[in-house]
């Protein structure tokens, strides 16, 4: 028996018992006749005392170093009052060792295990098996386990069936890039790794499995950002005979109970707020706004419709917008700070940032633009924005898409600077009534906002042929603290409607049959009305764990360049393997 107890288990009630522990040497303190070793496993830390009176055990303790794997036998005893450590669960006891054995020595680790030392992330990822020994990483992975377990238990109680869908599927290159897998048995043909089980879960609805879920691994070959990975995990769900409200109500119950159970220290705001897509874009410049703070966008276009200020006037003349954000009490910002905010706005596409400080003493306005306005225009602008003395007003004039992107970035930056977003608050919301399609100016075509299987609203079906841009989708996104937590929709379940949407997206009958023929045929055999959603597990756990990226809540993530530094994947393969797959590498 390697251990009778874990390193986080022993308490004063165990005093006098002989125990066997095994773990890693966390810290070692040599006081000559007494050597103290903090022995660690994933359950906690126990202090072990080696007395020179037990010469053999003491001799072993003299040789061990950090991260040695050690087995110890000894007797539990109560620590002296002055030696109690309130920072660990076992802090009232220690183990007096009478026997010890090194199970495996260890080289000096390239990273500190006992504490965060600010190493470059590349070092942490290269030695991930060491990084995962740290308390922070263990805490994150245990939280992830608890989240997934809660979801499984909740959905099982709701009558859902967990069904695994294939990892090797057909490539349908309509969204992000697929990861392709060559077939040895079928030369020149390829499987794709699933970007999501979307089509398969809809086919399960046709098959009669009316409540399906899966903790699904998904793959997308796309450019990486802080919250993206080439492979990720989502809670994939689908239900038959449901409408939008049925899905929303179930998910709201799931996440409310999940957060209250798994992260009870967090303040969960309920009921979940609800915004239309148009409202979210108008008020926040984003379809995933962080609603823990205000800083709403204010439309000033009508107030400035007749302005003589050429910068605003020229933008409005070509259908642009002028919008602003009021930053309460921040009129004291320095010019350097305002210049930094200007760069943030420019990162969203804005050509610049107009600013003004509302005077506190009835004096002149300090501003980059107010002197160019007509008499009374600044007062009207300030009134529209609800400005108070000492407020800072920030304004962008440009095309609506640029105004939205710039002010969204500005809003998030201000919240960060002013510490407006409480990390212990969870603010979920639903964004609904998305457009079904959006115009792709570069390709001169309509693209699906979500995916081509999203159902149009019944009352907008007649617009598909005449005014597609006005068609609203039966789509709903769950957002959390400024992130998209999950996207869902009611799906198309009739072949004629699906073909009409394919046609709108430029997918002709021949192409539709080649790529989606299995779906179209299935719809002819009694497909029920159905819908679902797919919340991201990685992102949810990232937010619950207060981590900056999903890499901190995944066991073995890739870098932002999609490289596994630990195993050096991707890597070359030998010529024999390529030949078996009928593949030849062609140099650029």
Swiss-Prot record:
GO MF terms held by the record: aspartate-tRNA ligase activity; aspartate-tRNA(Asn) ligase activity; ATP binding; nucleic acid binding
Catalytic activity, EC: 6.1.1.23
Annotated positions binding L-aspartate: 174, 220, 450, 491
Annotated compartments: Cytoplasm
SUPFAM superfamilies: Class II aaRS and biotin synthetases, GAD domain-like, Nucleic acid-binding proteins
InterPro entries recorded: Aa-tRNA-synt_II (IPR004364), aa-tRNA-synth_II (IPR006195), aa-tRNA-synth_II/BPL/LPL (IPR045864), Asp-tRNA-ligase_1 (IPR004524), Asp-tRNA-ligase_1_N (IPR047089), Asp/Asn-tRNA-synth_IIb (IPR002312), AspRS_core (IPR047090), GAD-like_sf (IPR004115)
Residues the record marks as site: Important for tRNA non-discrimination: 31
Superkingdom field: Bacteria
Region of interest: Aspartate: 198-201
Entry keyword set: Aminoacyl-tRNA synthetase, ATP-binding, Cytoplasm, Ligase, Nucleotide-binding, Protein biosynthesis
PROSITE patterns in the cross-refs: AA_TRNA_LIGASE_II
Reactions catalysed, as given in the entry: tRNA(Asx) + L-aspartate + ATP = L-aspartyl-tRNA(Asx) + AMP + diphosphate
GO cellular component, one term: cytoplasm
Pfam families xrefs: GAD, tRNA-synt_2, tRNA_anti-codon
Keyword Protein biosynthesis: yes
PANTHER family membership: ASPARTATE--TRNA LIGASE, MITOCHONDRIAL, ASPARTYL/LYSYL-TRNA SYNTHETASE
Protein name: Aspartate--tRNA(Asp/Asn) ligase
Organism listed in the record: Chloroflexus aggregans (strain MD-66 / DSM 9485)
């Amino acid at each position: 028996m390697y251990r009778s107890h874990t390193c986080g288990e022993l308490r004063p009630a165990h005093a006098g018992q002989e125990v066997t522990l095994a773990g890693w040497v966390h810290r070692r303190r040599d006081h000559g006749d007494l050597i103290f070793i903090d022995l660690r496993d994933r359950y906690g830390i126990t202090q072990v005392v080696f007395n020179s009176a037990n010469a053999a055990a003491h001799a072993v303790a003299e040789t061990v170093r950090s991260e040695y794997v050690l087995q110890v036998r000894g007797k539990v005893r109560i620590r002296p009052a002055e030696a109690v450590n309130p920072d660990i669960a076992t802090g009232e006891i220690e183990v007096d060792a009478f026997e010890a054995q090194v199970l495996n020595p260890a080289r000096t680790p390239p990273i500190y295990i006992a504490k965060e030392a600010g190493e470059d992330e590349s070092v942490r990822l290269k030695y991930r098996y060491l990084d995962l020994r740290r308390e922070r990483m263990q805490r994150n992975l245990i939280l992830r386990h608890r989240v997934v377990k809660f979801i499984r238990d909740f959905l099982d109680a709701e009558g859902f069936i967990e069904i695994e869908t294939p990892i090797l599927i057909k490539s349908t290159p309509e969204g992000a890039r697929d990861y392709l897998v060559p077939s040895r048995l079928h030369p020149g043909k390829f499987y794709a790794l699933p970007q999501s089980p979307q089509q398969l879960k809809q086919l399960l609805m046709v098959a009669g499995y009316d409540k399906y879920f899966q903790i699904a691994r998904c793959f997308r070959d796309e450019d990486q950002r802080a919250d993206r990975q080439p492979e990720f995990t989502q809670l994939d769900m689908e239900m038959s005979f449901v409408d939008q409200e049925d899905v929303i109500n179930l998910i709201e119950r799931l996440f409310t109970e999940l957060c209250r159970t798994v992260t009870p220290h967090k303040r969960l705001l309920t009921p979940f707020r609800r915004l239309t897509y148009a409202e979210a874009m108008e008020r926040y410049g984003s379809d995933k706004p962080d609603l823990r703070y205000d800083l709403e966008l204010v439309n000033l276009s009508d107030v400035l419709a007749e302005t003589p200020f050429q910068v605003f006037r020229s933008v409005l003349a070509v259908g642009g917008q002028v919008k602003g954000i009021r930053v309460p009490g921040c009129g004291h910002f320095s010019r350097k700070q305002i210049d930094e905010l200007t760069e943030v706005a420019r990162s969203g596409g804005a050509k610049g940032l107009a600013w003004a400080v509302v005077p506190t003493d009835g004096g002149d306005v300090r501003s980059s633009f107010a002197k160019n306005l007509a008499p009374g225009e600044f007062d009207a602008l300030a009134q529209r924005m609800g400005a108070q003395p000492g407020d800072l007003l920030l304004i962008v004039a440009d095309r609506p898409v640029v105004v939205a992107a710039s002010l969204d970035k500005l809003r998030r930056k201000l919240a960060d600077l002013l510490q407006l977003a409480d990390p212990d608050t969870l603010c979920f919301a639903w964004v609904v009534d998305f457009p079904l399609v959006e115009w792709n100016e570069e390709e001169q075509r309509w693209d699906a906002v979500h995916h081509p299987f999203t159902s149009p609203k019944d009352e907008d079906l007649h617009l598909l042929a005449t005014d597609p841009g006005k068609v609203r989708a039966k789509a709903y996104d769950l957002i959390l603290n400024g992130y998209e937590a999950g996207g869902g929709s009611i799906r198309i379940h009739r072949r004629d409607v699906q073909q009409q949407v394919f046609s709108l997206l430029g997918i002709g009958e021949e192409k539709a049959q080649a790529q989606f023929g299995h779906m179209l045929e299935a719809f002819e055999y009694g497909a029920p009305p159905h819908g679902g959603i797919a919340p991201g597990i990685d992102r949810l756990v990232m937010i619950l764990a207060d981590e900056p990226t999903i890499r901190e809540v995944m066991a073995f993530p890739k870098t932002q360049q999609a490289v596994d530094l630990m195993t050096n994947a991707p890597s070359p393969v030998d010529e024999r393997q390529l030949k078996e797959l009928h593949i030849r590498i062609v140099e650029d």
